[in-house]
Structure formats: C-alpha cells, structure tokens
C-alpha cells in the first residue's frame, strides 16, 4: 500500500519506511551504486540501490529503464551534503530501497524524452499523438493540477461563501442557430429530428432562476462548430453562473471577489479591488478595442476635430465620409522606428494593412517641434493645427505619431494592432504584471451587412439599459466583460425577465412573432409565471488557466485537446462510421472525397 507521494516527502520522514509508486524519470549508475529518480504527479524523489547496503533491491535496479513503472519500499535518509539538490522539493533526502518491484516495463522506443532532466523540443502533433506520455511531463502535469486547483477554489468560494448550488443542465438540447454553428446529433427514436450540443447553458440557467434556485453555477461543457484559433476549441469548459435579485454593481462586486479569491489561493497574488471599469465607448476611443491591455500606455488619440477642414484629403475625406482620424503617439519613436518599417514592405505597414488599413501616415516631431513628414501632410498643415496636435497628443521632440484615417472600425483595428505589436517590441509590457478590468455598456446590437439586419452583440437575452428603451436599436446593453491583460476571460449581463421586452428584442433582430415563439416559446411562457430579476456571467476556464499557467495556447491546459482542424490525433476522431449506424439514424452522407 502506498504511504506517500514522491514529491511530498521531506526531512520529517527521515528513518521512516515508505512505499512509493511511480515512473522512472532517470536512472544513473555511479560506481556500482544505482540512483533512480522516481516520479509521480507530485514530483520526484531519488531512490538509491546499493549492493552493500540494500542487496535485495540491487538486481532489479540494474534492469530498470526510463518510464518503467515501479513499486519501491525503502527507508528515508538524509542526503550527503555534496548530494543536496535545491532544485527539487525532495532535494534533502533520498530513499534506500529495500525492495523494488517492476509493475510494467517499456517495450517500444519512446517517441520523445519524458524526463524533466532533459530538455527536448517536441513537435505539437507528436505530443498530441502520444498525449498520455506528454501528460507525464512536469510542465503538463503541473498545468492539469493548476486547473484542478482553480476549479476547487471556484467551488469553495461559490458554495461556502456565496450560497451557490451546482446544477447540471442538459447536453442534448434543441438547436437555436443564433451565432456560431451548432454541433447536431440525430435522434434515432425521432427520425428526421435533431438535438444540438449546447453552445452555453444560457436558457437553462435562466429557467433555473425562474425555478427559484436563486444562485446557480456549473462547470459546464460547451460546444461550437467554428473555425479554430490558438485560444479556441470545438469543445470547451466554462464556469457558468446565474444570480437572482442582485443589481449590476452587486454582481460585479461578487465576481471581483471570486477572481481575487482564485488568484490569492492558487497563485498567492493579491488583486486590488474594486477593479477599474471602462465603458465600451471609452475602451474603443482610447485603445481601439473592447478588450484593452492596460499594462502599458500608448493610448490612441482622436484628432478628427483638428483635421476636419484639412487640405490633406486623406484625413478630411475620411471625416467627411463619417469616419475618423486617430493618432498613436510613440515616445522616442523617432529613434526606435525607421521609415522602412512604416512604408510599403515594412513590418508595421503589413500589420496595419492586414487589419484593413490602406497604409500608415506619420509625423516625426523633431527638435524645436519641427514636423518631419510627407509633403502632402506638411504642405496642408496649418500652424494652428500643428499646435493643436501637439497639445492633444502631448507630443515632444523624439515622438513618432502614427495616423489611422478611414472608417472608424478599420482605424481602431489597425491602430490597436500596431499598439500591441509596438508595446511588445519596445519592451513596454511587463510580463509579470496583471491588469484586470471591466468593460461595460456595450451596444445592444450590431449591424450584419451580409444579412442586412441587426443582431445581438452578445446574445438576445441581454437586458437593454432602461434609459434606452425608446430607441432599442441604439440601446446600450447591461453587459460586462472581465479583461485580463487584454484577453477576455469572462462575460455576462443582466437578463431580460419581462416577456414584452424580450419580444421587442426578438423583433429588433428580425424574428417574427411566429419564429420567436417556435424557437423560444418555452422561455416566453416562463416569463409569465413570476420571473425574478437576474443576471449572470460565464468564465472561459481553459483561457483563465492558460493565463495563470503562463501558456500561449489553451491546448496546453486541456488534457485531450483537439487540433486547429478540430481533430484528435490520439484517437483519430472524427472518424467515419458504418453505413448500418447511419441507416439506424435515418441519415445519409452526401460527402464525396475529392478525386
């Protein structure tokens, strides 16, 4: 029977007999004495087999190799001074093995080195193909244990301190195609009908509030059939929450306390509360993005008023067309950034054009506040405009001013992209710094040019600001996103809980009363039976753990992730199925492989 985990042993156990289980991380033979680093998920401890002191274990120790699975019984001993290893938690001790039992060996060559004692760069596809080996590696094991700690602290805070209850909601539900594509599941017992896997438990958690559950949470599995990026998966996990009878400030305060609790318990980091707040309009104006990274400055400056009557038609034309002109002021940019990088062919030019811009205009502020720029700008810049630009941007000699001009969306995208790129390149971002904030007051709707209609920016169950009910199409939503160093980790809103308001929102996004009732009649009916005011939020667990672990991809904090092609290299999913299975489901495939 196991008495301890490998990484939990310390000098307190010296002279005690222990039994351990684990994998051989490394084996060394020093002058006839064999040293084995035994590894389990808790860490590593050194096993010693000495033919003089522990002769019974020695013949077995001679035969073991890396990744063999062992049972080891022995006595904890103090390491000699010259053998102390401060790099591991058990570096003061070693185990003299009285017994070693090989529980299983390795019969094939390892596809990569698992041991943390050797560094080897392994292609991600190989890691995913042999994920069970990859998860033995220290970094990956620690990531999964960190994920467990985060979930454990979420549960502790919500249940023990805030009176939440955990409720599971259905995985097989009906399709309500508003947003990303659903994963569909054919029903065998109802031929021709389909379930959908949930993109979120949104409607069910609202119905739980109607049911009087008051405060609900769930570690929810969600599914979206969409094109993947580094921070997306077709199946993902979120902390899903819903609360009745709380005002918007109360919901924000509760969630701030939750996040502060997680950071303190998991990383021993103190988060200052309350968190800063930006409205959507402020975030877009100052940063060009609704999830700003506020660890550094380089804020955008709107200079449309200065150039509305400019003779430089690129600027004045953009403003006359309903667009804008903004500046990204860069201190010491004259020295750090060459013209080659800004002009066609340069890396910054490419960043801007990839975001939709046609190019980058610039002004270099020289000594005595002389402006160095292209002739078309310089020739059309009045002294009053020059002075106004200096005052508004705070520019000083050495500043480089990068301009975006055009439709507001493109200007924001291009300059916010340049801001982030330059923040990294100029060393302005402290990787150890943590900036959390709320972004609030999002627009209720955005225009879908392809479908020529309004659609909900978040989802159509978000409550509009009561001040904006007279002009719902232009309404602000009672919505809020939590941002962690420029990445959204959670988002939520107060919900609509009155049938007439919900019907107005459905009508605004182009749903007829018949369509709305067909898709959401069960929710509309529930609103007739005493629905409490309520609101909620969902946190992307994968993304939050990724950030806490300092990883670049959520695939490194998920046990068995999919690739960016939504496939599992370990199990070869998705796969074809037998024609008999399809027939039972009344389904036929129309796919024909390319010739």
Swiss-Prot record:
Segments for region (Aspartate): 202-205
EC number: 6.1.1.23
Job of this protein: Aspartyl-tRNA synthetase with relaxed tRNA specificity since it is able to aspartylate not only its cognate tRNA(Asp) but also tRNA(Asn). Reaction proceeds in two steps: L-aspartate is first activated by ATP to form Asp-AMP and then transferred to the acceptor end of tRNA(Asp/Asn).
Pfam family, one: tRNA-synt_2
Gene Ontology CC terms: cytoplasm
Location in or out of the cell: Cytoplasm
Record: residues binding L-aspartate: 178, 224, 458, 495
Source species taxonomy: Bacteria, Bacillati, Cyanobacteriota, Cyanophyceae, Oscillatoriophycideae
GO terms under biological process: aspartyl-tRNA aminoacylation
Protein name: Aspartate--tRNA(Asp/Asn) ligase
Top-level taxon of origin: Bacteria
Catalytic activity annotation: tRNA(Asx) + L-aspartate + ATP = L-aspartyl-tRNA(Asx) + AMP + diphosphate
Chief location of this protein within or outside the cell: cytoplasm
Organism: Microcystis aeruginosa (strain NIES-843 / IAM M-2473)
Keyword match Nucleotide-binding: yes
HAMAP family, per database record: Asp_tRNA_synth_type1 (MF_00044)
Gene that encodes the chain: aspS
InterPro entries in UniProt: Aa-tRNA-synt_II, aa-tRNA-synth_II, aa-tRNA-synth_II/BPL/LPL, Asp-tRNA-ligase_1, Asp-tRNA-ligase_1_N, Asp/Asn-tRNA-synth_IIb, AspRS_core, GAD-like_sf
Class of the enzyme per the UniProt entry, highest EC level: ligase
Site residues by UniProt (Important for tRNA non-discrimination): 30
Gene3D superfamilies in the record: Bira Bifunctional Protein, Domain 2, GAD-like domain, Nucleic acid-binding proteins
Record CDD domains: AspRS_core, EcAspRS_like_N
